[in-house]
Amino acid sequence: MAPKAPNYKLWAKMILGGAGIAVGGPAFVMYISPTEEELFKRYNPDLQKRALESRYERQKEYDDFVTELKKSAKSDKNIWITQQIEAEKKEKLARQMASANAAAEQARMQEEEHAKIEQMRREAGLPPTR
């Protein structure tokens, strides 16, 4: 039996259908998706006011994040490794600050305790300890 001739019409329909789905689907989603301004207009007034008030902080956080990413990207190491190293450095610094604050707080509490003892000694008519 002789081989069948290819059905070019069927192939053309399938290619056009696939292209229509591959291009038309995302285009349709973009067409029906609301823009940020349209979403913002749908907020109630309280949410709009809060969003406007916190816009600067969110923008600053995003800019800081992008700056950190750019710094990490300049390194020869993998970006995830450099970010982890930076996070560990920040955590270590925070722990050091916390321990320094705790030591200062402890010293302040000891001073207060000593001052209370001295006050009680004065009230009792005893000489100071120092």
UniProtKB/Swiss-Prot annotation:
It comes from the Eukaryota. One of its GO terms (cellular component) is mitochondrial inner membrane. It is a single-pass membrane protein. Keywords: Chaperone, Coiled coil, Membrane, Mitochondrion, Mitochondrion inner membrane, Transmembrane, Transmembrane helix. InterPro entries: Cbp4. Residues 108-124 have a biased composition (Basic and acidic residues). Residues 86-125 form a coiled coil. It is found in: Mitochondrion inner membrane. The keyword Membrane applies. The chain crosses the membrane at residues 14-34. GO terms for biological process: mitochondrial respiratory chain complex III assembly. Pfam families: CBP4. Residues 99-130 are annotated as: Disordered. Belongs to the CBP4 family. Essential for the assembly of ubiquinol-cytochrome c reductase. It has a direct effect on the correct occurrence of the Rieske protein, core 4, core 5 and apocytochrome b. This is Assembly factor CBP4. It comes from Pyricularia oryzae (strain 70-15 / ATCC MYA-4617 / FGSC 8958) (Rice blast fungus).
